[in-house]
From Swiss-Prot:
It comes from Arabidopsis thaliana. It comes from the Eukaryota. Residues 35-48 have a biased composition (Polar residues). Expressed in seedlings, roots, shoots, leaves, flowers and siliques. The gene is SCL1. Pfam families: GRAS. Residues 220-280 are annotated as: Leucine repeat I (LRI). This is Scarecrow-like protein 1.
Length: 593
């Protein structure tokens, strides 16, 4: 107990920012990577398809993130804004620490100049409870963390029933052998333990063992140390995990190769998990958003340089265009239009339709809990879309409906008789808590409510990975494999020292990674599910699959062949389109009726 207290105090002292910019010494390999294997970059931009005339779009600029203004924005954030833990009166720890205390010899660029009142104050009354496969500190004085027995029993029964219906057997904790193929990369911890535990017959043998152990550590890759650290943490070995966190911070860089970049973000997720500060970091990263144009540009860059996300939008738009062909009045309901990128493309596509064009009405749910934009930001996005529609001769009206997604009802959506109704879910459903979080299954309730609207078409675009119900360690493995593919794909499209690339990784990827790794329960917002689970949920809600047409599939396939390297792949399974980096499925798009 004393040892764990010391470790926790050490963790508290080392909590720092999730995101940093590296000094020149952190550069590992400044080699520039092109988009395709031929070594040229003339096929880099997808702007011709996604945004044919970038110069006419007031939301985009060629230099979306001038370094000076970007750093000034974050470093000038007010210091009187705080996110404090509700319990404890211990010393506040700056989320970014002093400039001299940063690992990787780095300096803070991203942050909110906030301080966290960490839940590791030695003066606080705490108890340890088991959450999944790890031990976390819970605070009972003013936090209702213990539920009534009857509620817990009811939740268990509901989960058991829905698990049987949804086929959750794959979510059970399994050995690492069943998660992935074991190779030498994953043997770091075992080799280290063997060296440490081997009998010492003489002082010479002791010396050799010590040298051998050092060699193992020095030769270990960031991936090996990350996995060993996550395993140690899942087993409650805090001191071992902390040691590996410190080791990782010396060898990773947000400007290094993909393995170093993803390790830089995931190690901070592990540190936040040990410090129970994941939810505070998550809040801090959305406490003060950049100016609207910059945020929009960051999302736009992500869709251009990691095109699997854009392919998902294009597939949904293709299905929508086919569904509204010949219709006069079309009403699209979108529960999170993000930054409106999908509808920029859709409006231009409608403008190119032959004959009479439909009149389009778009209702966007402006959820105050959304992590994609500031409250009220949807109105600004709507104005941009209306201007774009006017410029392209498309009849278009936009309505931002401020409401929590969980309480939206048919009566509030303003559906009218005679109009063709389309519902679009793009990277939104995974934010809704399901039966594994609460007895009120908001994820399935939303789908049933949408079914009651009798839409002509429902489109779903989601990440194809399970970070929802799996326990911590297998979830960590899945998240690493998934985001490794994302970071590797970015390595083919933007140079490693690119300011745009670092902004994309910070604003669009890092926050999700930390939330997946560090948080549990209702605090874990990023709850992706695999394609099969989404399929089961849609069918349980009463929807029938509508396979993507050959035209939609062929159009995207041709786009990939013409403008992207052959590592981007499109696979069709059960009428759904899977967009992959090499053999790893990243995004899945499907249509339902």
């Amino acid at each position: 107990m004393v040892e764990q207290t010391v470790v926790r105090e050490h963790i508290k002292a080392r909590v720092m920012s999730l995101v940093r910019s590296a000094e020149p010494s952190s550069y590992r390999n400044p080699k520039l990577y092109t988009l395709n294997e031929n070594g040229n970059n003339n096929g880099v931009s997808s702007a011709q398809i996604f945004d044919p005339d970038r110069s006419k779009n007031p939301c985009l600029t060629d230099d979306s993130y001038p370094s000076q203004s970007y750093e000034k924005y974050f470093l000038d954030s007010p210091t009187d804004e705080f996110v404090q833990h509700p319990i404890g009166s211990g010393a506040s720890v700056s989320s970014f620490g002093s400039l001299d205390s940063f690992p990787y010899q780095s300096r803070p660029v991203l942050g909110c100049s906030m301080e966290f009142q960490l839940p590791l104050d030695s003066t606080s009354t705490s108890s340890t409870r088991l959450l999944g496969d790890y031990q976390a500190v819970s605070y009972s004085p003013s936090m209702d963390v213990v539920e009534e027995f009857d509620d817990e029993q009811m939740r268990s029964k509901i989960q058991e029933l829905e698990r049987a219906l949804l086929g959750d057997e794959d979510d059970k904790m399994v050995g690492i052998d069943n998660l992935m193929e074991i190779d030498s990369e994953w043997s770091y911890q075992n080799e280290s333990e063997q060296h440490q535990d081997s009998p010492k017959e003489s002082s010479s043998a002791d010396s050799n063992s010590h040298v051998s152990s050092k060699e193992v550590v020095s030769q270990a890759t960031p991936k090996q140390i990350l996995i060993s650290c996550a395993r140690a943490l899942s087993e409650g070995k805090l001191e071992e995990a902390l040691s590996m966190v410190n080791e990782l911070r010396q060898i990773v860089s947000i400007q290094g190769d993909p393995s170093q970049r993803i390790a830089a973000y995931m190690v901070e997720g592990l540190a936040a998990r040990m410090a129970a500060s994941g939810k505070f970091i998550y809040r801090a990263l959305k406490c003060k958003e950049p100016p609207s144009d910059e945020r929009l540009a960051a999302m736009q860059v992500l869709f251009e340089v990691c095109p699997c996300f854009k392919f998902g939008f294009l597939a949904a738009n293709g299905a929508i265009l086919e569904a509204i062909k010949g219709e006069e009045e079309v009403h699209i309901i979108d529960f999170d239009i993000n930054q409106g990128n999908q509808y920029m493309t859709l409006i231009r596509s409608i403008a190119e339709l032959p004959g009479k064009r439909p009149r389009l009405r778009l209702t966007g749910i402006d959820d105050p809990e959304s992590v994609q934009r500031s409250i009220g930001g949807l109105r600004i996005i709507g104005l941009r879309l209306e201007q774009l529609a006017e410029d392209n001769g498309v009849s278009f009206k936009f309505k931002a409906m401020p409401s929590k997604t969980s309480i939206v009802s048919p009566s509030t959506l303003g559906c009218k008789p005679g109009e063709t109704l389309i519902v679009n879910f793009a990277f939104q459903l995974h934010h809704m808590p399901d039966e594994s979080v609460t007895t009120v299954n908001q994820r399935d309730e939303l789908l049933h409510m949408v079914k009651s609207l009798n839409p002509k078409l429902v489109t779903v675009v989601e990440q194809d990975v399970n970070t929802n119900t799996s326990p911590f360690f297998p979830r960590f493995i899945e998240a690493y494999e998934y985001y490794s593919a994302v970071f590797e794909s970015l390595d083919m499209t933007l140079p490693r020292e690119s300011q745009e690339r670092m902004n994309v990784e910070r604003q669009c990827l890092a926050r999700d990674i930390v939330n997946i790794v560090a948080c549990e329960g209702e605090e874990r917002i990023e709850r992706y599910e695999a394609a099969g689970k989404w399929r089961a949920r849609m069918m349980m809600a009463g929807f029938n699959p509508k396979p993507m047409s050959a035209k939609v599939t062929n159009n995207i396939q041709n786009l990939i062949k013409q403008q992207y390297c052959n590592k981007y792949k499109l696979k069709e399974e059960m009428g759904e389109l899977h967009f992959c980096w090499e053999e790893k499925s990243l995004i899945v798009a499907s249509a339902w009726r």
